Structures are given as C-alpha cells and as structure tokens.
UniProtKB/Swiss-Prot annotation:
Domain named CMP/dCMP-type deaminase: residues: 47-167, 186-292
GO cellular component assignments: cytosol
EC number(s) per entry: 3.5.4.5
NCBIfam families per the UniProt record, alphabetical: cyt_deam_dimer, PRK09027.1
Family matches, as CDD domains: cytidine_deaminase (cd01283)
Positions of the catalytic residues: E103
Recorded catalytic activity of this chain's protein: cytidine + H2O + H(+) = uridine + NH4(+); 2'-deoxycytidine + H2O + H(+) = 2'-deoxyuridine + NH4(+)
GO molecular function, one term: zinc ion binding
Lineage: Bacteria, Pseudomonadati, Pseudomonadota, Gammaproteobacteria, Pasteurellales
Organism: Haemophilus influenzae (strain PittGG)
Family designation: Belongs to the cytidine and deoxycytidylate deaminase family.
GO biological process assignments: cytidine deamination
Record-linked PROSITE patterns: CYT_DCMP_DEAMINASES_1 (PS00903), CYT_DCMP_DEAMINASES_2 (PS51747)
Protein name per the record: Cytidine deaminase
Entry-linked InterPro entries: APOBEC/CMP_deaminase_Zn-bd, CMP_dCMP_dom, Cyd/dCyd_deaminase_Zn-bd, Cyt/Deoxycyt_deaminase, Cyt_deam_dimer, Cytidine_deaminase-like, Cytidine_deaminase_bacteria
Length: 292
C-alpha cells in the first residue's frame, strides 16, 4: 500500500509529503482525524472541502477492481470533522451483488470507527442510485451534503427526490445511530464474543436478523464487521463486506487471515451461505459459524 500511495501522490509536492507522513505514522490506515485535517488545512491554506477533493485519488487507491478496473474514491466527513476514506471493492469469481460501492465503503468505515453522523460525502464520480438509497438510511440523511469535483454543496435529497426510506416502513432506527439487540457475549472463545458484539450493533430493523463477523489475523489483530440493512433491501451491506472493507482500508492482507467467525441470529434470513461463497474465492480459511 505504501508504494501505491506514493505513486498516487507525487512526492515532489509538499502537501503530498505531509499527507504521506500522516498515513505512515498510522500504518497506512485510510483515515484522518479532525486534528490532522485541521493541521493540514492550516499549513497549506486549504479549506476542508479542498483537502477532501485533493485526497480523492488517494482514497480511490484503496480500491480492488478486478472486474471493472474503474476505481472510485470517497471520503465521508463525520460531524466532528474526521475523514473516513472509502473505495469500491469488487470480488472476482463471485456474484456481482457482493460488491461494495465507494460510498458504502466510506460509510461503513466510519461506522466501524464508531462515527454517529455523516455531514458530507465527497466522491470523485456522481453517486449511483444504489449509493443514494444507501445514504438515505443514515442518521441525519436529510442534512448530508454531496460534493463532486464538478459540483459541490448538493443536498442528498436533490439526488433522491420523493425518496423511499425507513419512515415509509414505520422504522425509526437509522444507520449509524446506536444499536442494541440484547445479544450476550459469554462464549469461552474471545473471537466468538467479538463476533457477537459486532452482531449486537447491527442495523437490521427490517429482518431483525443481526449478524456479525470477527476476523483474526496472524499478528493477533482482530477486525470486526456488522450488518447494515436498508429499507430497499438490496443496498444492504452484509457484515463480511464491512469487515473486509475495513481490512482493506487499514492495509490488512487477506493472506494473513487466521480465523473468521460469524455470529448470527437468523430469524427471517441468513447470510451464512453468502459469506461462505465469497470467502471461498478469497481464502482457504473456513468460516466458523455460531447461531445465536
């Protein structure tokens, strides 16, 4: 990732050097906190939005696009000013529905870092209908601004007029708001407990079927993923995708995976088979499944 980032940001530019130094200090995680953002803006006389626009090619460099070879970068800006990178993630030799779109990537990245509200979405290409619908599920969606290289300060609902969303199904819960499904993490295996805790934070008001993923890497690091459901159903993002996306955006190598656990309360639906199908194309490590 280090060399790819350096190729994306030519190092004969002082701003690019400063950005690379920040990323190097955090092992190439695609994230800048508010203090880092403000320091860069101050040192190089940039607005927050101009810095985000400058970072879009960098965000796109985290893409995996074996199918389309079309890299999309996104930056979700949290309500406190943190920058969460996102990029489209494609999975060859699996169903195209397994894909993670860049806006989904940035939002789920923010969610797994416990962000509660997105104020702005900055992206290098106009959001597709799938992503517009996904963003409409967010806590505070009515206040989100969309920024493109050719057009800034656009309300999300200008891209999705007469929108269908949670309110049409009498659902008050929104993605990024605090969730609790009263799942108890009392297993003797800590990795199973982490998958249960992730499931407990799922957003699944339509199926009430939470599931979570916990991935153990060979160095002892653990990445978890939660299920993000959508009022329109198809734009929903399974927990395996949110976990893999977080791994990609934080420079984890899938070849270093040691164990993968899924914990699921499958009341109306199950993601077990879908997860196993995708994993079979990525790793020889088998899914460990725990029914809740």
């Amino acid at each position: 990732m280090q060399e790819l980032i350096k190729r994306t940001l030519p190092q004969d530019d002082a701003l690019n050097q400063a950005i690379v130094n920040e990323l190097r200090s955090q092992n190439w995680a695609g994230f800048l906190n508010y203090s880092q953002v403000q320091q860069l803006c101050h040192n190089f006389e940039l607005t927050t939005l101009k810095l985000a626009m400058h970072l879009l090619p960098l965000a796109a460099s985290y893409s995996h696009t074996a199918i389309s070879h079309f890299n999309v970068g996104a930056i979700a800006i949290g309500e406190q000013g943190d920058f969460y990178f996102g990029a489209n993630q494609e999975f060859a030799n699996s169903a195209i529905q397994q894909t993670i779109h860049a806006e989904q990537s940035a939002i789920s990245h923010a969610w797994l870092r416990n962000e509660r509200r997105i104020s702005d979405m900055v992206v290098n290409y106009t959001p597709c209908g799938h992503c517009r619908q996904f963003m409409n599920e967010l806590h505070g969606a009515e206040k989100i601004s969309i920024h493109l290289p050719h057009s800034q300060n656009n309300p999300l609902h200008s891209y999705l007029p007469d929108a269908f969303g949670p309110k049409d199904l009498d659902i008050a819960a929104h993605l990024l708001a605090e969730e609790n499904h009263d799942l108890v993490a009392d297993h003797q295996d800590d990795l199973v407990n982490q998958a249960i805790l992730a499931a407990n934070q799922s957003h699944c008001p339509y199926s009430n079927s939470p599931h979570g993923i916990a991935i153990l890497f060979k160095n002892g690091d653990v990445v978890t993923g939660r299920y993000a459901e959508n009022a329109a159903f198809n734009p929903s993002l399974p927990a395996l995708q949110t976990a893999l996306n977080f791994a990609y955006l934080n420079d984890r190598k899938l070849s270093d995976i040691e164990r993968i656990v899924m914990a699921e309360k499958a009341l109306k639906l199950s993601h077990k088979t879908m997860a196993e199908t995708l994993l079979s194309t990525l790793t020889s490590v088998e899914l460990e499944y725990y029914s809740l």
